[in-house]
């Protein structure tokens, strides 16, 4: 997505065009067809688990799906929210949005948003681990008979993107 660091502008525009507008909660038909949005946005660190964004109903599902990756130490499931990344645009219109918990590596301290934020700071083994886990969760989500459990639909948030106009 573009404009993430300026206020989730790219993902917000996509969600508004295809799924609904969180400022008035006028949802589009496609909103009911998407099961989940997965986001991997914190650099090259290994996946350690998933922020569930307060979605208690999905906890047993992800626990089962992550079990095969216990040897890769990707077992943490927290109901806590995490912010400042694109899954929030989807969550704001009632689509389950999840951010992976990752090892921070140098992400916040040395390379994040600097001219040092380049491919030579990637860790191939971490990327392979992350790709495997993300692919498995996307596959499990797609093959599931029903959509992932959803939290109650949030109230309209007319102020949510006012800061970025």
Where do the language-model regions lie?
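Active-site-adjacent substrate-binding region
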Residues: 43-165
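Acidic/histidine-rich catalytic neighborhood of metal-dependent amide-processing enzymes
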Residues: 1-61
């Amino acid at each position: 997505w573009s404009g993430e660091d300026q206020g989730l502008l790219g993902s917000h525009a996509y969600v508004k065009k295809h799924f609904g507008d969180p400022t008035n909660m006028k949802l589009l038909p496609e909103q009911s067809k998407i099961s989940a949005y997965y986001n991997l946005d914190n650099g090259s660190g290994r996946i350690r688990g998933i922020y569930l964004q307060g979605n208690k109903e999905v906890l047993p599902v992800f626990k089962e799906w992550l079990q095969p990756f216990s040897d890769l130490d990707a077992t943490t499931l927290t109901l806590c929210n995490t912010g400042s990344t694109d899954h929030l645009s989807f969550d704001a219109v009632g689509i389950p949005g999840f951010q992976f918990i990752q090892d921070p590596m140098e992400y916040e301290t040395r390379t994040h948003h600097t001219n040092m934020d380049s491919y030579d700071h990637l860790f191939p083994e971490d990327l392979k681990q992350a790709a495997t886990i993300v692919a498995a969760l996307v596959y499990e989500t797609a093959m599931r008979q029903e959509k992932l459990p959803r939290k109650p639909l949030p109230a309209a948030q007319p102020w949510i993107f006012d800061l970025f106009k």
